[in-house]
């Protein structure tokens, strides 16, 4: 791939080889090619003067040696295509590879919440491809995404009947908090709606018919409104909501009134004129797509609907009851049409003769920015469809077109190829837009949320004949594509490595340190230290004129401007900076694409050099350096021989450099740097990380005199880990306090030392606990100074308000892996608990360890919470929030298990872990504390959380005991859980109402017969307890229902299993179903007793006459009525099941007229086939009836 195309696709330079700096900088300056604050291989940072490597490097291997082909049948030269998640369920594979009629109508969808489904005819196959509760963090997603060996469990549902078939876009699968099994709602194209409260039970569904005569094409979930929005091909909207009435789910719908703007009603005739369409005045508008644009603080949701006529923006209230059309903008489409003409045909044909056909293909809204994929054909010029990506933002009264990006992927357009030309779709990721057809994916790079793909992108081809892409989604910033042949696959640029981000000191995931203003003040700096250190700083001795003349590259020029700033020569500063800004924004003379991050790379290069510059006056370093000239222009060097003074000089020089960036207005031009293939890190945050590592080094050096042996051992282990060896008279400490790029590794070394000391002990002793205490104190002291510095100097690294919402905030102290400290902190917590606090009895030491554990937990959670706040409006927020909540609960539980309730409560209160707070109140039996939390966290609905917690613990009774003083909370709880309202009635002594509520709940119960029996039994008890009321009639109804339940319980397990029922957890069966199971052919052991029970159940059937006939026919078919000895007909008859049923009925005192149907019913029965026409059957049947008539005669009526 050519370099300009590489830059176009990935927004980075690939000009340097592994180990070299990837800044596209000239190497004229020796000091600009020396070392990196972001680490890398030690072999790339030796004192031999080899080029250094930075975190802006996006791979350890060049593209020429990196394999990107992962799956046979998918061709990609520069991207890695890997299988994602578990293998597809077998039944899904069978549906996808189905080759019969209708195979081409199979559709599929993959969603961000981890669920996927396939639609084949009326079959809906649902499975969970990713467990969002256990997914890994995004930096590790490259490793976690690889396919495991287990199969995902698939659920099959039956869709409602539809003449127009079913589409996967009209289905939504979701799982709410506390719900064990997902729910599903489906809308057919003809408007038949079906809702399943649990996808595990196909038969338990609710149906509704809406807006007949229309064709529905898309279903949109509205979480705020707890509903759904269905849209037809003509942009008619229907709001759907699932309700719960008396414990039974119901569906409700509301048709959104159509727009009455100038494009609605009679104004439709003018729409085509206004936007230039030649499609006929009477043609209805056609839907392109519908998106949930934003959720406002008021609870309202903004929905955007794009058609081929206009774009509508609707506002829906938080309860979905009211809607408001904000506006309908047709001018947006006119502007898109004009952009096509301007960019593709303006210079080829006279503008007056241009008539183009505009096609809007796909529509998405991401972070309040609208993305539209459009195509246009100028038939008069050439039968070719041209494509473009359009971005826009919503204004108060119209849509603002922000950008129009032509795409060089033209297709031949004809009647035969029209479907293929119009099939292009796209998904929007954090750093790329992925265009795709059924066979090809085009990854296009995003810069500031705008596509920059004017060149043709690389094609990722799914080239197997029977393969095609069925769906695509962005999940946790990872693009996933659902292939008919390969299932779910992920696509990442070929230079991406899931572990690489973890190995880079400050480029893990996008982060954002989020202060409020841009003020370059270092007001809290120690001015006395500044004065005292001035004589040691080498930068005051450097001649700016000499540097300006000698170093002609951009790095050298900006260094010179910095020195002029220190000399207060503002004219030269302005001259150099202006020229530099012109150069970095000018077009490349060779025609290569402009490097959008060039200025950021220059600034970070200088900051890295400053942080790792060696002390210029130390003769030991002169001896170690092969090239003495490479340190001559070092602006971070100190003349001091003491390490602590060298570090202080560096932080002062760094502060001067940041002040220079602000005063020269260079800071306002800084943006971001690509870190890995999917991450953009703000330059201001990278600079903050660099300065904080200098401060951390100062803090460690300051306490080294207190614990010299331990810290020296950790430093030696850290430098050895870097594969560095001191040369000449240099020591490990000299190297460590210069190589600050990987300073965080010293914390890992301290944890390793603790493990080694523990492993060396035969048993845990108090000395180990003291040792762990010392290590914790080092870590906490150092990080305490870092956080203090971060707070004091936040304004110096603050981003502008415009850039603030665009980036994420993940400081190095919160990063996982070797790039940060978070994993080490978690490890120290575990060590402190297992080998510290649990193993000592000394009160003071034990309390010190718990205090340290408390502080370590606070550091871990604070970093994760800060990061979580910065990604609130991104795709990965839900996944990261679940991870945060899981780790929060796990860490606080450590303190709760050890009964450190006060520490646990402080953490839980700070990070709003309500589950831990309720658990603390429960274990301490502190009812007052629970009431205090209810008042304190009223805005978070703490009382409802606490009540639900008790329910999950199966402690229903305690809810009313503990919250009886909070009637408001109980009332709200009863409204949300109507199936438990009877408990409060019991507590209040209202047994009559409790009996009625329980009986109503039992009538609504259709899932588990055991639950229905319990409800009926409780209702009967409540009725008996209502001594003052006469509930005889209700008790009789209850007894009748209990009798029906008892009949069901007597069914054999074999017959239940043969019909697919679970004998252990039986669902509620109707009387007709129970009868059918009693008399079924599969019930081979059924005797006259089972058939008698079936007859007894006729009183529960709406049409008993027909069912009685069915029972007797089933009994007749059990025996042979034609092959018998006529001489012994009576004897043979008495062995028939038919006769035995009559006989047992007679013994039980039943009248034959009520038991037996008329004989003519059997002689004319269709169910018996040709048996009634056979004479032997007729004879034996008539004999039976005659014999039975005599048997049922009363003794007084018999003649002697």
UniProtKB/Swiss-Prot annotation:
Q: Which Pfam families match?
A: Nucleoporin_N (PF08801)
Residue ranges for the region (Disordered) are: 1-28
Claim: GTP-binding is one of the keywords in the record: no
Q: Give the chief site where it resides.
A: nucleus
Q: Which domain of life is it from?
A: Eukaryota
Per the record, the similarity remark reads: Belongs to the nucleoporin Nup133 family.
Cite the PANTHER family for this sequence. Answer: NUCLEAR PORE COMPLEX PROTEIN NUP133
| Official protein name in the record | Nuclear pore complex protein Nup133
Q: Identify the coding gene.
A: Nup133
């Amino acid at each position: 791939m050519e370099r300009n195309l590489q830059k176009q696709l990935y927004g980075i330079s690939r000009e340097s080889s592994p180990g070299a700096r990837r800044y596209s900088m000239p190497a004229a300056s020796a000091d600009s090619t020396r070392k990196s604050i972001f680490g890398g291989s030690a072999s790339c940072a030796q004192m031999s003067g080899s080029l250094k490597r930075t975190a802006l490097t996006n791979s350890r291997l060049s593209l020429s040696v990196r394999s990107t082909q992962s799956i046979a049948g998918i061709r990609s030269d520069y991207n890695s295509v890997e299988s994602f998640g578990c293998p597809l369920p077998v039944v899904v594979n069978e549906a996808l590879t189905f080759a019969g009629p209708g195979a081409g109508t199979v559709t599929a969808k993959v969603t961000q919440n981890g669920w996927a489904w396939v639609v084949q005819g009326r079959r809906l196959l649902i499975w969970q491809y990713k467990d969002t509760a256990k997914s890994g963090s995004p930096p590790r997603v490259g490793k976690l995404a690889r396919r495991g060996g287990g199969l995902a469990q698939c659920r099959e549902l039956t869709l409602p009947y539809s003449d127009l078939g079913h589409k996967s876009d009209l289905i939504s699968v979701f799982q709410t908090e506390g719900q064990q099994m997902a729910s599903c709602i489906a809308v057919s194209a003809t408007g038949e709606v079906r809702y399943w409260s649990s996808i595990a039970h196909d038969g338990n569904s609710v149906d509704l018919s809406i807006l007949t005569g229309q064709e529905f094409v898309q279903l949109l979930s509205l979480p705020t409104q707890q509903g759904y929005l269905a849209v037809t091909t003509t942009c008619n909207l229907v709001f759907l909501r699932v309700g719960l009435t008396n414990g039974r789910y119901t569906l409700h719908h509301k048709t959104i009134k159509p727009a009455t703007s100038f494009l609605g009603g009679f104004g439709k005739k003018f729409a085509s004129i206004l936007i230039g369409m030649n499609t006929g005045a009477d043609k209805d508008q056609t839907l392109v797509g519908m998106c949930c644009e934003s959720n406002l603080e008021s609870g309202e949701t903004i929905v955007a609907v794009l058609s081929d006529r206009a774009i509508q923006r609707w506002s829906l209230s938080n309860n979905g009851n009211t809607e408001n059309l904000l506006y309908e903008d047709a001018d947006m489409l006119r502007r898109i049409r004009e952009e096509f003409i301007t960019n593709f045909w303006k210079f080829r044909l006279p503008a007056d003769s241009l008539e183009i056909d505009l096609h809007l293909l796909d529509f998405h809204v991401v972070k309040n920015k609208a993305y539209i994929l459009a195509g246009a054909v100028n038939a008069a010029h050439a039968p070719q469809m041209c494509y473009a990506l359009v971005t826009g933002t919503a204004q108060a009264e119209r849509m603002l077109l922000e950008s129009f990006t032509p795409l060089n992927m033209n297709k031949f357009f004809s009647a035969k190829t029209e479907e293929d030309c119009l099939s292009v779709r796209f998904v929007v990721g954090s750093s790329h837009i992925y265009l795709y057809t059924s066979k090809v994916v085009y990854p296009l790079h995003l810069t500031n949320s705008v596509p920059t793909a004017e060149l043709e992108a690389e094609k990722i081809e799914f080239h197997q004949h029977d393969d095609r892409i069925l769906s695509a989604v962005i999940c946790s910033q990872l693009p996933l594509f659902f292939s008919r042949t390969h299932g779910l696959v992920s696509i990442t640029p070929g230079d991406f490595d899931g572990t690489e981000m973890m190995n880079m000191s400050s480029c893990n995931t996008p982060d954002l340190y989020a202060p409020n203003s841009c003020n370059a003040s270092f007001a809290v700096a120690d001015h006395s230290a500044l004065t005292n250190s001035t004589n040691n700083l080498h930068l005051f001795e450097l001649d700016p004129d000499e540097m300006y003349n000698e170093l002609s590259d951009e790095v050298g020029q900006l260094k010179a401007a910095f020195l002029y700033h220190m000399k207060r020569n503002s004219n030269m500063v302005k001259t150099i900076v202006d020229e530099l800004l012109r150069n970095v924004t000018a077009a490349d003379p060779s025609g290569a694409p402009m490097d959008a991050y060039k200025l950021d790379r220059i600034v970070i290069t200088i900051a890295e050099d400053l942080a790792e510059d060696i002390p210029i006056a130390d003769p030991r370093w002169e001896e170690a350096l092969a090239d003495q000239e490479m340190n001559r222009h070092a602006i971070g060097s100190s003349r001091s021989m003491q390490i602590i003074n060298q570090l202080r000089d560096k932080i002062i020089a760094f502060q001067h450099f940041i002040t220079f960036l602000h005063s020269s207005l260079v800071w306002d031009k800084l943006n971001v740097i690509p870190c890995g293939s999917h991450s953009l890190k703000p330059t201001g945050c990278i600079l903050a990380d660099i300065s904080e590592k200098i401060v951390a080094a100062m803090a460690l050096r300051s306490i080294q005199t207190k614990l010299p042996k331990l810290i020296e051992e950790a430093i030696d282990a850290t430098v050895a880990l870097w594969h560095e060896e001191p040369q000449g008279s240099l020591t490990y400490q000299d190297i460590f306090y210069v190589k600050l790029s990987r300073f965080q590794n010293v914390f890992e070394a301290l944890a390793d030392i603790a493990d080694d000391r523990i492993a060396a002990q035969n048993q845990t002793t108090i000395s180990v606990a003291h040792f762990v205490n010392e290590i914790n104190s080092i870590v906490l002291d150092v990080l305490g100074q870092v956080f203090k510095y971060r707070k004091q100097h936040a304004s110096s690294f603050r981003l502008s308000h415009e850039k603030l919402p665009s980036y994420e905030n993940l400081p190095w102290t919160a990063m996982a892996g070797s790039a940060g400290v978070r994993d080490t902190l978690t490890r120290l917590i575990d060590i402190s608990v297992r080998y510290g606090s649990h193993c000592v009895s000394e009160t003071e030491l034990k309390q010190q360890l718990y205090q340290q554990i408390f502080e370590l937990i606070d550091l871990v959670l604070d970093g994760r919470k800060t990061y979580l706040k910065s990604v609130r409006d991104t795709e990965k927020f839900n996944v990261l929030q679940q991870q945060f909540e899981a780790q929060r609960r796990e860490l606080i539980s450590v303190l709760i298990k050890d009964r450190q309730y006060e520490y646990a409560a402080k953490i839980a209160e700070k990070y709003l872990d309500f589950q831990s707070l309720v658990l603390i109140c429960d274990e301490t039996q502190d009812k007052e504390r629970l009431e205090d939390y209810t008042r304190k966290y009223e805005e978070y609905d703490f009382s409802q959380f606490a009540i639900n917690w008790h329910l999950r613990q199966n402690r229903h009774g305690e809810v009313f005991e503990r919250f009886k003083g909070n009637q408001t909370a109980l009332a709200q709880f009863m409204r949300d859980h109507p199936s438990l309202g009877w408990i409060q009635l019991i507590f209040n002594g209202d047994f009559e109402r409790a009996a009625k509520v329980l009986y109503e709940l039992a009538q609504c119960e259709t899932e588990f017969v055991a639950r229905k029996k319990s409800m009926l039994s409780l209702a009967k008890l409540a009725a008996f307890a209502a001594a003052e009321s006469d509930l005889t009639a209700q008790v009789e109804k209850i007894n009748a229902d209990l009798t029906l339940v008892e009949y069901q319980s007597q069914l054999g397990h074999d017959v239940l299993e043969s019909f697919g029922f679970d004998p252990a957890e039986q669902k509620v069966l109707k009387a007709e179903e129970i009868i059918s199971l009693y008399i079924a052919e599969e019930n081979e052991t059924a005797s006259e007793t089972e058939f008698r029970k079936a007859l007894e159940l006729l009183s529960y059937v709406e049409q008993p006459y027909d069912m009685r006939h069915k029972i007797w026919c089933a009994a007749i078919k059990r025996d042979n009525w034609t092959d018998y000895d006529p001489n012994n007909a009576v004897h043979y008859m008495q062995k028939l099941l038919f006769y035995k049923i009559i006989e047992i009925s007679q013994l039980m005192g039943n009248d034959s007229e009520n038991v037996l149907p008329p004989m003519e019913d059997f002689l004319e029965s269709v169910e018996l086939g040709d048996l009634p026409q056979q004479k032997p059957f007729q004879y034996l049947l008539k004999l039976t009836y005659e014999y039975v008539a005599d048997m049922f005669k009363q003794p007084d009526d018999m003649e002697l």
